[in-house]
Each structure stands twice: as C-alpha cells, then as structure tokens.
Amino acid sequence: MKQIFKTEMKRAMSGKGMVLSILIGTVLGIAHVIREIIPAYRANLTNFYNEFPILSPHSAAETWMAGSPSNLEGFIFFLILPILASLPFGTSYFEDCKEGVIKNIYMRTKREDYLKAKYAAAFLSGGIAVLVPLIFNLMCSLVLLPNLAPLSTMGDNILTPLMLFYKIFFTHPMIYTTFFLVLQFLMAGIWACVCLSVSFLSDYKIVVLIFPFFVQLILHVICTITNHIDYSSVYWVQPGHGIIAWWIPVVYLVIGISVTFFVFMKKGVREDVF
C-alpha cells in the first residue's frame, strides 16, 4: 500500500492536470492582486485615512481573495473549486480503466490497496491544487498590506457576532484565516473524491470531471432560492463570509468523506476490469 500510494502521489503531483489547475487558480489570484490588492495598497499610501479617522486602512485579512465575498475573482474561484480540485487526479481511475493500466496494477497489488491509495492521492492532490493559488494570493496581500486586526464596523467583511470564531477574526485574523485554509483544503479533497467516485457513471471523461461542479452549483442555487446562502459551500469556506453554525462544515465533511469513500471502494472492488 505504501509503495502504490507513493506512485499515485507522484503521478498526481507531476501530471498536466495539477499544472493546469494551479495555473487557472493563480491567474485568478493575479487578477485579484491587480484589481483589488494593488489599489488597496495605493489607497493606504494616501492621506485619506488621516482625513477620515473613523475608517481603517485596508488590511491583508480582509482584502485577499477569500477575505471578502464581494470580489469577482474570489467568487469565480470558489464556484469552480470542484473543477480545480478534480483536475489533478480526480479522473485518474477513469483513465486507468480506459487505458487498461488498471489490469496490470491489479496483477501486482490488491484491489483494496490500490483503491485506498488512489482515494488518498486524489484527496491530497485536490487540496494542494486549490491551496497553492490561495496561499499565493494571501502572501501577495501580506506583502502589500498591513496585517491589521479588522474593524467590526466599516469593514469589507460581513461577519456578525453570530458567526463561528467571530472574536478570533477580529483579534487574530491570521489564525482565523489559517483555520479556513484547512477547511478549503478538506473541501477541495472531498470534491476531488466526488469526481473519483462517479468514474463508474459515464463513458465520457468530461462528464466525470465536471460532475462535482454541477453538484456544488445545484446546491448553491437551492441555497440561494431558499434564502439559505450561508449553507452554500461557495460561501461558507470563505473567511470573509464566515460560518453561521458549526454543524454546516461538519455535515459537509462527514457526508462528503464517508459517502465518496464508501461508493468508490464498493464499486471499485466489484468493477470488472478484465
């Protein structure tokens, strides 16, 4: 199992899908730096805040791509996050079956070991692909903007005292941001494994790849039209939006990991590849 996991991780990290995913995410991150962070940096250099002391200078925690739910690049990034997470290795099982590679693998190792290694590699590579552009954008924000504690009034965020870890955001914003980076990593891993678990449903790779995106899109639309936008994974993974109840990420994570692992393992063990 250890050796096959190393092999799968090497395939995931060195594949074209990983490069493409990070490239797309980084382009969005750079666009956000140009449209939001640099103008905020220039605004901080003026005397505007001396004339209006009630206002606070732009801070890194509020201005980076996930610091405010109102910026376009951040919305696009988190909307297509399932695709970004699936590009590196989400379709790898589908490709192994189509190309006949899986037959050779099954003659050298146990099915369960291969499937577990595949699941773990897809989960980790999906999380890494999503986290790299986010950390890049956050670092750009920290380089150009001060790491000030945000204000509860007149800020770019929409956090209220009802939000989870509300006080931490306004006292230690980077600790709060790090917590959300972990959540973003986990959700990206889950979306990659959703892609993995539906490899059995279609004969077309593109259908397998975009399936997680449409799952999130449908959930987002339902949350929007029912006026429960706080439940949409497009928003609650963003620190600038916040989490209104602790059970929201718990439900997503528990159901996401358990269902995808169960379906992938059960279907994978029974799948006739010979």
Predicted regions and their residues:
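Aromatic- and glycine-rich beta-strand/loop motifs that create alpha-glucan
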Residues: 1-26
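Membrane-helix interface segments
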Residues: 17-18, 110-112, 116, 204-209
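Central hydrophobic cores of alpha-helical transmembrane segments
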Residues: 21-26, 205-219, 256
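Secretory targeting signals
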Residues: 24-84, 90, 94, 119-192, ...
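Transmembrane helix-loop junctions in multipass membrane proteins, especially transporters and channels
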Residues: 37-45, 138-150, 204, 224, ...
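Helix-loop-helix units of permease transmembrane domains in multi-pass membrane transporters
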Residues: 92-125
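Junction motif at the cytosolic side of a transmembrane helix
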Residues: 197, 254-274
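Extracellular/periplasmic helix-loop-helix junctions in multi-pass membrane proteins
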Residues: 202, 209, 222-247
